[in-house]
């Protein structure tokens, strides 16, 4: 990072402002470091907390208040001592633990699944209502900081959630997951601005007479500049993700050390949930502390005003509450208009439906795998943390490997997604092998032994690397030019909102079956559902339809097309 970043900034040519209040100052290394700092801060919560320990802590807190599925008189945890009662009095090791919530009896695994379904619904609604804050007005950075610190506090507060107040844990999970999703949407809203004001885009260093010809050539060949911007955007985005994953692996290793240290003491035997609560406190502190560089270095970069606000004058100020309501109404109207436009584009709609199903399947398998390892395979928290690291490491390998596979065999991005669906389908099918009598007699194959889940985690990570890398690549050509922000907002809501249904249905199945394993039947069906839609998807036809819509509407107005709608 340059110590003279402010001087460097002064030397860079600024773009002409497109609206009143736009910050067109050139992007500096200091600002880029501020943007990169946030994935390092927040990705730790996404991977370590959401991906590993939140499902475990929810199940553990509920278990300490629960009773066995086949005998409601026996507690799942012997409160008179430290001994677990899973196998006592002839009870099977796979016995599910049940708990009463609001006059309903659910399993402790379902308690975690239902909580995440509720969190996803709240997150999706919040994303829809707050989308205009990401694109318009001076609130982008303020909202980013608000969500970041709210989420970090929610994670840290788990240190106070003992089994006696376990019903407060879902509230903190919902707040944390919602804050995480909304903060990343707000962070991503900075990306096109940082790219647009990058030194190489603004004619870096000094504007001289000799450089005018370059600007003229660039104007005659806008696709070259567009391609450079897309490449730079992809590079910055991938670096942010890479930094975030490295930070997550680092904190996960620290978490394993914490769990190991607690396992050597008598504290864990008396308070089984305490080590995980300490880890969540650490994650919250990490999130808050590493957000500080973003707070200090990332410029606010105000967005364009909303259309109706352009006519307002300073002589007619509005209250904060009325401004909030105005932004929310605009967000809902904008989302509804974008949804109607997407419905009129057959190929775009087909992809969004397939992505809805695929995203739901991916999220459901991830959550179910952790709880299956916890309740059916009886794996400890250290083993689950190692499982998370295995999946993350494989995901990084997959992200690098799939492009090589695509280049080697000249595959289309859609084909890569179909390969990922096929790989994901192998996971529930392998779990179903545990129902076959021959394999049941062997005692392994079909996820009957803890070690079997690690190769499954490798497969899951590799497949996830492909899904994460190629879903946007397939979707991008299907968007009308000039509507990128609106359609990617729809993509984000489809991604986040879909994950509410699969976990809830798995929870319902577990409640009625008394075991997670039968849910593999549902997962096998859920994973394969998007495959026919992806197979029928005609990307070239979708590209032509999107271009025709943009030409018919006279668009091509860039990132801020929603500013001038209506």
Curated annotation (Swiss-Prot):
Pfam families: ATG22. Residues 547-566 are annotated as: Disordered. Keywords: Amino-acid transport, Autophagy, Glycoprotein, Membrane, Transmembrane, Transmembrane helix, Transport, Vacuole. InterPro entries: Atg22, Atg22-like, ATG22/LtaA_families, MFS_trans_sf. Glycans are attached at residues 103, 200. The chain crosses the membrane at residues 38-58, 110-130, 146-168, 179-199, 242-262, 278-298, 351-371, 382-402, 416-436, 451-471, 488-510, 519-539. The keyword Membrane applies. It is found in: Vacuole membrane. This is Autophagy-related protein 22-1. It comes from Phaeosphaeria nodorum (strain SN15 / ATCC MYA-4574 / FGSC 10173).
